[in-house]
Structures are given as C-alpha cells and as structure tokens.
From Swiss-Prot:
Gene: vs
Its biological purpose: Binds to the host (E.coli) valyl--tRNA ligase and thereby changes several of its physicochemical properties.
Organism listed in the record: Enterobacteria phage T4
Protein name: Valyl--tRNA ligase modifier
Length: 115
C-alpha cells in the first residue's frame, strides 16, 4: 500500500496538469482500484502495475497536444504494448496480457482526455 501511495504522490510531483474534470484523487483512486482488480492481493504486482498505469496516464497527457487524432494515438499505444508485452507472452498468458494492455490504453486515454 505504501508503494502505491508513493507512486501516486510521484504523479503529483511530476506536475501533472489534470483538468477540472479529473482531480488527483480520482486518478489515484482509479490507479489503486485498477491495480487491485488486475493483481488481486499481490502487493508487489499492484505496485508495479500502478506504476505502469501512471506512466500510461502521463504518456497520454504528453501526447494530448499531438496533431494526430485520439483514435490513431490509442491504436498506436495499444500496438506498442501488445508488441512489447503480449508478443513474448506464453500462450496461456495471452488473455491476461491483453487485459493488461486494455487497462493501460484506458489509462492513456484518460491522460489524453485532459485536453
């Protein structure tokens, strides 16, 4: 739990500029809820996945000024994670990997939505 809180505080310290619709509390709750849902009770997994979610959110915030449409950016981001993570995963782990990518893309989309 402490690692997750440290990661969330790290998000705030990176000067994330969330819009009025998305507060830091909402982001932190989303990251904690999603990491707990994906990893179950494994705290190490939760901390690692929460960090990936925060990075995905920050990537979305950085890309929000891109000249590309959101759909194009989301497809590229999903393809990147599918290539990095799911192409090397064993066959039995493919479904879990695709679930992870979906959650990362959702976090990226939340970052993009701060336009």
């Amino acid at each position: 739990m402490t690692k997750i809180l440290v990661l969330c505080i790290g998000l705030i310290s990176f000067s994330a500029s969330a819009s009025a619709d998305t507060s830091y509390t909402e982001i932190r709750e989303y990251v904690n809820r999603t990491a707990a849902d994906y990893c179950g009770k494994n705290k190490a997994c939760q901390a690692e996945f929460a960090q990936k979610l925060i990075y995905a959110y920050k990537d979305g915030e950085r890309d929000k000024s891109s000249r590309y449409k959101n759909d194009t950016l989301l497809k590229r981001y999903a393809k990147k994670w599918n290539t990095l993570e799911c192409s090397v995963a064993e066959e039995k782990d493919k479904a879990a990997c695709h679930s992870m990518v979906d959650r990362l893309v959702d976090s990226y989309n939340r970052g993009l939505s701060t336009r």
